[in-house]
Amino acid sequence: GFSVPFPGTLTSALMLSDTAAKENYGAIRVMGGGYVNTELRSLSDGRIFDFVDFITFDDGQLPLERLCDLKEGRCSHNDLVRTVYRRDDGTLAERLNVDCNIPFGQLPPPDFSDFDRTHYISLTELTNPMHKLWSDGRWNKMTVAHGCYHKKCAFCDTSLDYIGRSDAPSPEIVVERMEHIVAQTGIRGFHFTDEALPPALLAGVCRLIVERGIAV
């Protein structure tokens, strides 16, 4: 699967997807991400499916789970969620079901067990201290809650699911995820990537960190 957050990453994702198909015949190629969510919701030209098999929108957990079920023969195309694909006759099929989501608190923590971060360099793109803060050094990137708790800024597209649908887990779940990630990575610095996480949730997380004596 390829997450395409910006227009500048689209071409490389399509090239890699095309290479993956040639190297691994039968693999399902899936594309999602921020650019897809904002720019590809109204597809009329199916040529992009020369490079990918499926395009998914918004949260990818359930769409990807259904695609795995489809490949294993456990469901049909009609069971797909927030997914677009090209039929054999060249027409495009949409299976949206936009309200189907796995609650954020029920998702498992990310698995870094076989991810060796020593193979990656620390990169500082700009001298701006704000940008350097979250890119210089190795940080555990983590989303504390789904969406934005405020979602009232005039400059923001609050119609997008990853902004407009707020879904926050309990502080206990957040701290347990943090402990799990630290145990796997050995890295104790965290960069929360939320649009705007609930202050009450963050306060609860901080209290638990202090109570449990967790060094982060």
Where do the PLM segments sit?
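Glycine-rich beta-alpha loop elements in corrinoid/cobalamin-binding modules
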Residues: 1-103
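General N-terminal targeting signals
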Residues: 17-19, 46-48, 72-73, 110, ...
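Generic alpha-helical secondary-structure signal
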Residues: 66-67, 110, 177
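Generic secondary-structure boundary/loop-capping signal
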Residues: 81-82, 101-104, 109, 145-146, ...
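A broadly conserved sequence feature marking short terminus-proximal activation segments
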Residues: 86-129
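Radical SAM [4Fe-4S] cluster-binding motif and immediate context
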Residues: 113-216
